[in-house]
UniProtKB/Swiss-Prot annotation:
Described purpose of this protein according to its UniProt entry: Autoactivated endoprotease able to hydrolyze alpha2-gliadin, a recombinant wheat gluten protein, with a preference for Gln-Gln-Pro-X-Pro-Gln motif, cleavage occurring after the first Gln residue.
Enzyme class: hydrolase
Keyword Disulfide bond: yes
Name under which the protein is recorded: Cysteine proteinase EP-B 2
Propeptide stretch(es), residue numbers: 29-133
Gene: EPB2
Coiled coil residues, start to end: none
Sugar-bearing residue positions: 130
Signal sequence segment: 1-28
pH sensitivity of activity: Optimum pH is 4.5.
Origin superkingdom: Eukaryota
Length: 373
């Protein structure tokens, strides 16, 4: 296993089992033809959905949203009944949201008007790897390099979650220590080029981490789903660990082969178009669209593989909680032939670079005895 210990692997497997159990407590609402046959049946379905997802709507709001719920329920049921795609949808917690609300709340938060920071580490370190020599499948979860699925809530902070997945991953690979890191530090403190819940870019976040002495743990600086005052110095006093990186590199744009080269070696941050209804209500299987390339959501690729039907896929970690998709993940079709990859997954990929396990801490972090990773 190299630097990643068997203890880390067991811990990650236990966490995955617990996550699945938690998801089952909020299972998908089954739908049959009879559930959509009448207004009365649809109202009953809506009430069951609200109960299952612990959603409370006032009378007027409930009636206003019912029309959207009906439309979404028909869309999901029709897709699943046709069975002409290798993936299924379900009536998840977004069930009574229209796409405009969903986009404003959970996606559409990458700052396309702000240029990303150029890579501080030049080149593409995996360029010389022969694609034919790469393993046929990779899953960094099984190697103990991925923490549990998190939930960004109603905050446009996907960029921070995407960044953190990649940094947690390379840190675990280099040090053998899987540490959950703080998205909240990025939201509160990385404000020069990123904008908290209003959006940001992963490349800029990597450079913040490099230039500001690393990233603190989630335990010391927990997530609040809202932007607040940067208090990393105070939080650092209670944190035994801070994780450093050397910078970042970009994967050559629009190349799924180069993305595979990188993912074979570490988790990679990517941007996708995630605002479509099919992505919104994804449940299981290999996602084959529909989606475009208007990049609006930051996620992370933590592996790749081939499904039983022979369809290749990317394993993507999302930040919408473990009740979405396949316990918080989506398998996106790999090598689809689409320019930039399906949903634009290969258009703007990047990853943190970490060559040493314990670099010298910067003075900003010198606030008592702490371990530097």
């Amino acid at each position: 296993m190299g630097l990643l210990s068997k203890k880390l692997l067991v811990a990650s497997m236990v966490a995955a089992v617990l996550a699945v159990a938690a998801v089952e407590l909020c299972s998908a609402i089954p739908m049959e033809d009879k559930d959509l046959e009448s207004e009365e049946a649809l109202w009953d379905l809506y009430e069951r959905w609200q109960s299952a997802h612990r959603v409370r709507r006032h009378h007027a709001e409930k009636h206003r949203r019912f029309g959207t719920f009906k439309s979404n329920a028909h869309f999901i049921h029709s897709h699943n009944k046709r069975g002409d795609h290798p993936y299924r949808l379900h009536l998840n917690r977004f069930g009574d949201m229209d796409q405009a609300e969903f986009r404003a709340t959970f996606v559409g938060d990458l700052r396309r008007d702000t240029p990303s920071k150029p890579p501080s580490v030049p080149g593409f370190m995996y360029a010389a790897l022969n694609v034919s020599d790469l393993p046929p499948s990779v899953d960094w979860r099984q190697k103990g390099a991925v923490t549990g699925v998190k939930d960004q809530g109603k905050c446009g902070s996907c960029w921070a979650f995407s960044t953190v997945v990649s940094v947690e991953g390379i840190n675990a690979i280099r040090t053998g220590s899987l540490v959950s890191l703080s998205e909240q530090e990025l939201i509160d403190c990385d404000t020069a080029d990123n904008d908290g819940c209003q959006g940001g870019l992963m490349d800029n976040a990597f450079e913040y981490i490099k230039n500001n002495g690393g990233l603190i743990t989630e335990a010391a600086y927990p997530y609040r789903a809202a932007r607040g005052t940067c208090n990393v110095a105070r939080a650092a006093q209670n944190s035994p660990v801070v994780v450093h990186i050397d910078g970042h590199q970009d994967v050559p744009a629009n190349s799924e082969e180069d993305l595979a080269r990188a993912v074979a070696n570490q988790p990679v941050s990517v941007a996708v178009e995630a605002s479509g209804k099919a992505f919104m209500f994804y449940s299981e299987g290999v996602f084959t669209g529909e989606c475009g390339t208007e990049l609006d959501h930051g996620v992370a690729v933590v592996g790749y593989g081939v499904a039983e039907d022979g369809k290749a896929y990317w394993t993507v970690k999302n930040s919408w909680g473990p009740s979405w998709g396949e316990q918080g993940y989506i398998r996106v079709e790999k090598d689809s032939g689409a320019s930039g990859g399906l949903c634009g997954i290969a258009m703007e990929a990047s990853y943190p670079v970490k060559t040493y396990s314990k670099p010298k801490p910067t003075p900003r972090r010198a606030l008592g005895a702490r371990e530097s990773l």
